[in-house]
Amino acid sequence: MRRMTDISPDKFAKAAEAIYEIFEKVVENHDEILDAIDKLLILERKGVFDEIVKFSEFKVPFTPDEIREIAERFEMLIKILLSVDERVLKVIKRLIDAFEESMVYEQMGMMEAMKALRDPDVQKAIGFALTLAKNFGKRI
């Protein structure tokens, strides 16, 4: 085990300076660092990193160009995931849950469909879908 006396004053000074520089960077960027940590925790809780590990074990021969293209697309996907607002992720999760619950359904005629339009939940979903369609239409 090394003791403090084993380290030369010059090396100790350089180490202290390096630690101070790191500390300054942390202080300057603490909001961004905390935000990045929060996003990493979200990705971890959602199992994204486990999937990345599984993907790394995938044994398919790719050309260097294919690997570069996959890496670029994966980087873009990560940037998109990190830029998505938490509220959007929650809406997507609820959409997936609703989709799973809707896998068992009964056939419905025109009259039943018209009656269903009176349901506040159906009206809320239609309002959301129409707003989404309008906003999406502006961007295509």
UniProtKB/Swiss-Prot annotation:
InterPro entries: DUF1641. It holds the Pfam family DUF1641. It comes from the Archaea. To B.subtilis YrhD. This is Uncharacterized protein AF_1717. It comes from Archaeoglobus fulgidus (strain ATCC 49558 / DSM 4304 / JCM 9628 / NBRC 100126 / VC-16).
